[in-house]
Amino acid sequence: MEDGARLILRSSAALREKEKVLVLVDRDTKPMGDAFLAAARSLGTDPVMICILPREHDAEEPPELVATAMESADLILLATRKSLTHTHARRQANRAGARVISMPGITA
């Protein structure tokens, strides 16, 4: 899994050393988050992973504390069961300059 995560970080995200990386997961997708965390570390970053309670439906906002963290990241990996793509938190993070890769429903 880590090799696949590293490929995504290099090719799709164009991850650069020392960027601030946030990996957002829920309990169902934590194993994938662990792979992205390890891959990001191997590429010279000090990533942070936050595990939230699974959302009830797509586009449900994450907790306010998570939204604040998203605004300060360079790259956000949304590896959650439900989609966070169409949330205010994601839009605000993009406006603040973050790149976002959304992978709702990702499995190992």
What is the predicted role of each segment?
Residues 1-108:
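Active-site bordering "gate/hinge" segments
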